[in-house]
Amino acid sequence: MMGSAQTLATRHAPNPRGLVMGMGLKTLQKRLSHLTGNAIRDYRMIEEGDRVMVCLSGGKDSYALLDVLLRLQKRAPVRFELVAVNLDQKQPGFPEHVLPEYLASLGVPYRILEADTYSTVERVIPEGKTKCSLCSRLRRGLLYGAAEEMGCSKIALGHHRDDILETFFLNLFYGGRLAAMPPKLRSNNGRHVVIRPLAYVPEPYLERYAERMAFPIIPCTLCGSQPDLKRQMIKAMLREWGEIEPRRLANIFSALQNVQPSHLADKELYDFINLVGSVQPGEDPVSALETPHGDGFPAAEVLSGVQRHDPQSA
């Protein structure tokens, strides 16, 4: 456990939708660097000598992730490498020139992977069904393979705080389980560590930063045609909550870091089965209380004025 809920809540920004609109670029950069740096430090995401593969999709989140990591790299107490990787999934109309030109302008090492996962998803998933799950699995496998080839020890993804909260409520409402996106995890093949350095960053910061930086955003034609996804409904719910009570989302995220298994109901996380008290079966309940308890006086004294009823004498 990393600290009390109150302390944890202060480490993360409250819902900043109104506040962020008035922020200047420098203020936004400092805030993003601060939140990202905290997450990296809290979970030891990046260590000395790491070669970090930054997955770049062409969306606002991954652009911001690369930008912030490049800034942190210049002043970090540890030395690490960054390699940007994009997967060209052969979606119709995908502007293949945008990312290579952008990455070349930054002078950052990069690699463009090419795989026609678009056709696979279109062929396998029926019309009107959600394509995100299969698309994600195919993409993940290709990225793991690329990380292996390039000798990358860490794989950095652009998921932010609100992505994590959305996943939590999706699992809660539709899956019947308490689970979200962890800030750090071992990859499926066990060879790499996947990190989410933007885990503390609320989405409005990234929306505003993308506008101010004029990132060359590339829309996803697979997801953009599915407006009724459950995740989008959850997103709308969280956005409304944030407007009603600005600290609510920060407090929910803090709760994910402050789990108390003994106050839930999962028998695998807490041994409820073997949980017993000190009173033995058949023992006189008042005499059992003669031993001083944590409050410093015999609990039996509290019961001294209570009339005892013996069913045998009734």
Curated annotation (Swiss-Prot):
It is an enzyme of class 2 (transferase). [4Fe-4S] cluster binds at residues 132, 135, 223. Binds 1 [4Fe-4S] cluster per subunit. The cluster is chelated by three Cys residues, the fourth Fe has a free coordination site that may bind a sulfur atom transferred from the persulfide of IscS. The keyword tRNA-binding applies. GO terms for molecular function: 4 iron, 4 sulfur cluster binding; ATP binding; magnesium ion binding; sulfurtransferase activity; tRNA binding. One of its GO terms (cellular component) is cytoplasm. InterPro entries: Rossmann-like_a/b/a_fold, TilS/TtcA_N, tRNA_Cyd_32_2_STrfase. Transmembrane segments: none annotated. Pathway: tRNA modification. Its cofactor is Mg(2+); [4Fe-4S] cluster. Its EC number is 2.8.1.-. A motif (PP-loop motif) lies at residues 57-62. GO terms for biological process: tRNA thio-modification. Pfam families: ATP_bind_3 (PF01171). It is found in: Cytoplasm. The keyword Magnesium applies. Catalyzes the ATP-dependent 2-thiolation of cytidine in position 32 of tRNA, to form 2-thiocytidine (s(2)C32). The sulfur atoms are provided by the cysteine/cysteine desulfurase (IscS) system. The thiolation reaction likely consists of two steps: a first activation step by ATP to form an adenylated intermediate of the target base of tRNA, and a second nucleophilic substitution step of the sulfur (S) atom supplied by the hydrosulfide attached to the Fe-S cluster. Homodimer. HAMAP family: TtcA (MF_01850). PANTHER family: AMINOTRAN_5 DOMAIN-CONTAINING PROTEIN, SULFURTRANSFERASE-RELATED. This is tRNA-cytidine(32) 2-sulfurtransferase. It comes from Alkalilimnicola ehrlichii (strain ATCC BAA-1101 / DSM 17681 / MLHE-1). The lineage of its organism: Bacteria, Pseudomonadati, Pseudomonadota, Gammaproteobacteria, Chromatiales.
